[in-house]
């Protein structure tokens, strides 16, 4: 038997089965159930307080919603596709439970402002969760920086060895990136944390409602000033998806680093066994599946951003049913980014650096820049110094030798300005600690950065 539509008074025919199947959103928007109930309870309390409905009915509504909330939490609630969405399912269940009083809940409210209120409550909570997860990740990166401050490794440009750095400098680089990600989400909260309820379908409400009361009940810091904007705008969700995409890009870069560094060709990093998988045929394999999936899921989040941008780009004001398609991309991105941050955090916490391998790789021709700087400090124009040291590198490469093997006599063949102290520059630790500029890889700079982040993250 087909359920009677709550909006069916104007129609002479039952809804076609195809339309019910095509337009339903309950298969995914039940994610909003608890947020919808929270919004409805605040609305009901306000209706009773304002005398718009009898206080007794308001109390019945709140009690009925609390019962439904418990059923949902216990997975006992029966969802009906023919009731279209989460909001209609809950309202119908409420009316069945408490009778005519349930029909008064929708007084002074439209599904348009109801839906977007639940959506904002959902996004507000999950954005704060993401901020907290990012901060936990930052703490793990800070711990790794402290653990490996006395380990050197090569920094890469073009995936070629560039210059030696302290490993702590590498971990602090990602800590900085995730700080900006976190700040973007924090800033996004300002535009999420706005109450749309009370805007009605599009033009406002002709009952003496108290939006300030509802905002306080629901914990919103602001009330949206324009009813058209409140019910039809999704820029806050687009901003959220953009932030997710940028954050996923940073996590994908870290994942790529770890995939490369944990390969046998590099062997810089040992990943925890419990966070890797094996092969069905090759017994020696230790696959970085978590990292690979984070790298792969990044494209999925990009797609979600493009999906919603495409939905909203041609919509006239105000609400259009197209906006039903805002939920899927956001729900999927929330699940994806939260899982990815947790995965990266576990990887960071459990990884171990191979000190011997990283130190060996940090030497060699990665030290060449400092020989050029040595000559520049003695008055040689840097471009000329660069050419001289390039000739030294070519000389050694042709002999199959590393830079550390060169003697002072050989250096003097290329420039008489080389002295005994130039040989000290053939140590990656010495070279790293020459980078004393603010933000550099010298130990004194790294200790200063660690002190700074300790105050920020562990206050």
UniProtKB/Swiss-Prot annotation:
Pfam families in UniProt: ASL_C2, Lyase_1
Localization per Swiss-Prot or TrEMBL: Cytoplasm
EC number: 4.3.2.1
Ion transport recorded as keyword: no
Keyword presence, RNA-binding: no
Gene3D superfamilies, per the entry: Fumarase/aspartase (C-terminal domain), Fumarase/aspartase (Central domain), Fumarase/aspartase (N-terminal domain)
GO molecular function, one term: argininosuccinate lyase activity
Gene: argH
Pathway: Amino-acid biosynthesis; L-arginine biosynthesis; L-arginine from L-ornithine and carbamoyl phosphate: step 3/3
InterPro entries: Arg_succ_lyase_C, Argininosuccinate_lyase, Fumarase/histidase_N, Fumarate_lyase_CS, Fumarate_lyase_fam, Fumarate_lyase_N, L-Aspartase-like
Reaction equation(s) it catalyzes: 2-(N(omega)-L-arginino)succinate = fumarate + L-arginine
Family per similarity comment: Belongs to the lyase 1 family. Argininosuccinate lyase subfamily.
SUPFAM superfamilies in the cross-refs: L-aspartase-like (SSF48557)
Official protein name in the record: Argininosuccinate lyase
Coiled coil spans: none
GO cellular component terms given for this protein: cytosol
Predominant place of localization: cytoplasm
Assigned keywords, A-Z: Amino-acid biosynthesis, Arginine biosynthesis, Cytoplasm, Lyase
């Amino acid at each position: 038997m087909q359920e009677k539509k709550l909006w069916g008074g104007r129609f002479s025919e039952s809804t076609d089965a195809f339309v019910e199947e095509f337009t339903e959103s309950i298969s995914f928007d039940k994610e909003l159930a608890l947020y919808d109930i929270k919004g409805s309870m605040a609305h009901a309390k306000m209706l009773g307080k304002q005398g718009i409905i009898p206080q007794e009915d308001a109390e019945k509504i709140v009690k009925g919603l609390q019962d439904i909330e418990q059923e949902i939490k216990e997975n006992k609630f029966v969802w009906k596709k023919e009731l279209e969405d989460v909001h209609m399912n809950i309202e119908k269940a409420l009316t069945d439970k408490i009778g005519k009083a349930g029909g008064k809940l929708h007084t002074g409210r439209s599904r348009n402002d109801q839906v977007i209120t639940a959506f904002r409550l959902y996004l507000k909570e999950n954005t704060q969760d993401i901020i907290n997860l990012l901060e936990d990740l930052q703490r793990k990166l800070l711990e790794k920086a402290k653990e490996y401050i006395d380990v050197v490794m090569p920094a890469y440009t073009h995936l070629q060895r560039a210059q030696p750095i302290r490993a702590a400098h590498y971990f602090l680089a990602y800590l900085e990136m995730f700080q900006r990600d976190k700040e973007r989400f924090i800033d996004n909260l300002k535009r999420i944390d706005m109450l749309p309820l009370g805007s009605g379908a599009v033009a406002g409400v002709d009952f003496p409602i108290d939006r300030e009361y509802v905002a306080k009940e629901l914990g919103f810091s602001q009330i949206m000033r324009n009813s058209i904007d409140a019910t039809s705008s999704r820029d806050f969700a687009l901003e959220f998806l953009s932030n997710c995409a940028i954050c996923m890009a940073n996590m994908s870069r870290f994942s790529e680093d770890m995939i490369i560094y944990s390969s046998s060709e590099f062997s810089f990093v040992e990943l925890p066994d419990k966070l890797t998988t094996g092969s069905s045929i090759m017994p020696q394999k230790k696959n970085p599946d978590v990292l690979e999936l984070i790298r792969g899921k990044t494209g999925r989040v990009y797609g979600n951003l493009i999906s919603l941008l495409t939905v909203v780009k041609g919509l006239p004001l105000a609400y259009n049913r197209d906006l039903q398609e805002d939920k899927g991309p956001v729900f999927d991105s929330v699940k994806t980014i939260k899982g990815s941050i947790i995965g990266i955090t576990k990887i960071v916490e459990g990884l171990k650096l191979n000190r011997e391998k990283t130190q060996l790789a940090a030497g060699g021709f990665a030290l060449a820049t400092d020989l050029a700087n040595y000559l520049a400090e003695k008055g040689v124009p840097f471009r000329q110094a660069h050419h001289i040291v390039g000739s030294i590198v070519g000389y050694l490469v042709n002999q199959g030798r590393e830079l550390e093997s060169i003697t002072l006599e050989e250096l003097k063949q290329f420039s008489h300005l080389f002295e005994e102290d130039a040989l000290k520059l053939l140590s990656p630790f010495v070279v790293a600690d020459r980078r004393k500029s603010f933000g550099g890889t010298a130990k004194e700079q790294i200790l200063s950065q660690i002190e700074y982040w300790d105050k920020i993250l562990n206050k």
